A protein has these predicted regions:
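N-terminal regions that are enriched for targeting/export leaders
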Residues: 1-33
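Secretory-pathway luminal glycosyltransferase catalytic domains
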Residues: 2-15, 62-208
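Short, flexible/disordered intra-domain loops and linkers
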Residues: 23-28, 182-191, 242-253, 276-277
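Histidine-anchored nucleotide/phosphate-binding helix
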Residues: 33-46, 194-202
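Gly/Pro- and small hydrophobic-enriched strand-loop and loop-to-helix capping segments
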Residues: 45-57, 273, 286-300
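Short, solvent-exposed loop/turn segments at secondary-structure junctions
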Residues: 56-61, 128-130, 177-181, 216-220, ...
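Donor-binding and catalytic core of enzymes assembling or modifying cell-surface/extracellular glycoconjugates
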Residues: 209-293
Length: 300
């Protein structure tokens, strides 16, 4: 593999910045941001650059520890770059099961782009796919350090666990993505579709274990209340990406972040989705917290 030379002696650090809007578009979901962060960390290591993530300009920063702006970044003049880049060249939808996903053209494009930047610290948004899927502990520690709940959020997490009757690491997560149209557009969800997912779950769960249901559909969660082993949390949630967020001032951001943290304290994650791609929200939460993860495709 022949790569172009990185010759920008001025550039010292690249930062993946998660906020709602950029000069050329709006952000996708949190999972996309986490995926791109793993990708950029690998690029930074390859080129000998420092790497950092920054969520200080996103509404969820209100609920996180030590979320401060980074010197040298103009948050009003950031762009989206290489969004969803480095996808499998053969069009495979399950390539994350492999250990590598190396695309020299993608890496060279980034090198060429970075060579043009006249700054020491470069902030931008990237959701590209990593080249390697064996993620280093140092990278996981770095990302986790920026996603720590503050005192208010920790109290909210503890209160919620007590309300549910669950303890940290004492439950599994079943994360069900019925489709963003049910979360964002509040489309009515078909009862036959609900029962189809419910039957899959009934064949999945063990009678001696506890499961917390996380989903983009509160309607679906209500239908799972009748299953003894399943616990549900019915609260207003919000898509965290700027492209689909309806209200950045509502409690929805806080509650979606709550679901992320509850998932991070689980002992297993089952991710079910109508999409052909794996949910980054649950997948990367599992990776960051060393939680066993299994993906199940839902066919409508």
């Amino acid at each position: 593999m022949i790569l172009n030379k990185f010759v920008n002696n001025k550039l010292k650090k690249i930062v993946n910045v998660y906020q709602l809007n950029y000069i050329n578009g709006s952000s996708p979901g949190l999972g996309d941001f986490l995926r791109g962060s793993f990708c950029l960390n690998q690029i930074a290591n390859l080129l000998g650059l420092e790497f950092e993530i920054d969520v200080s300009n996103h509404p969820m920063a209100k609920y996180l520890e030590h979320s401060t702006h980074i010197h040298g970044i103009d948050y009003n003049n950031l762009e989206i770059a290489f969004q969803n880049g480095n996808k499998d060249q053969n069009g495979s939808i399950d390539y994350e099961g492999r250990q590598t996903n190396i695309n020299p053209n993608f890496i060279n494009d980034i090198i060429n782009w970075l060579n043009t930047k006249d700054c020491e610290v470069l902030g931008f948004f990237c959701s590209a796919f990593p080249s390697f899927f064996n993620h280093k502990p140092e990278c996981k520690a770095l990302i986790n350090s920026k996603l720590q709940p503050n005192e208010f959020m920790r109290n909210y997490i503890d209160y919620t666990l007590s309300e549910l009757g669950l303890t940290k690491k004492g439950y599994g997560i079943i994360h069900v993505r019925t489709g963003d149209n049910y979360l964002v557009n509040e489309d009515p969800i078909d009862i036959h579709f609900i029962n189809k997912i419910k039957n899959i779950i009934l064949n999945l769960i063990s009678p001696d274990r506890r499961y917390l249901i996380i989903s983009d559909s509160n309607v679906f969660k209500k239908h799972m209340k009748s299953v003894p082993q399943c616990y549900t949390l019915i609260r207003k949630i919000e898509h965290l990406g700027g492209e689909r967020m309806k209200n950045d001032k509502s409690t929805g951001v806080m509650n979606t972040l709550l679901e992320y943290f509850l998932m991070s304290y689980s002992n297993a994650i089952f991710s079910m989705s109508v999409y052909f791609h794996i949910s980054g929200f649950s997948k990367y939460c599992g990776i960051l917290n060393d939680i066993p993860f299994k993906y199940i495709k839902i066919y409508k």
